[in-house]
């Protein structure tokens, strides 16, 4: 769990999430539309920080990019949660998991594999992946996790 970087504190313990275009106003002990940002005592937290629900090595051609590092592999990661509700989502079991009625904060915090940004860089390098893809769910939702990973990836080259 990590405090969100894009939110505003409002009156009466409410917070306004500014991570995506839904701009959820979230009451204490409630979550936004993504299901992974929760108001805890007047602060907004991203619950599954450091918990990759998916971590795979994919051919870059699988991604919606044109002629980007052709014939290479990318290290792909995602967390649970999504601000979309696409009717034919192929990853609905991970994107919508946090919205199931009986999903608790602890379940979200412990979902997936404990994978720090540093470990992601190490695994990408070990597997000769010159890129990291933030994918499978809407990556804006895991902004803090992705951003911390990006900063380390840039330093690592």
Regions found by a protein language model. Name each.
Residues 9-12, 28, 70:
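Short, ordered beta-strand-loop transition motifs
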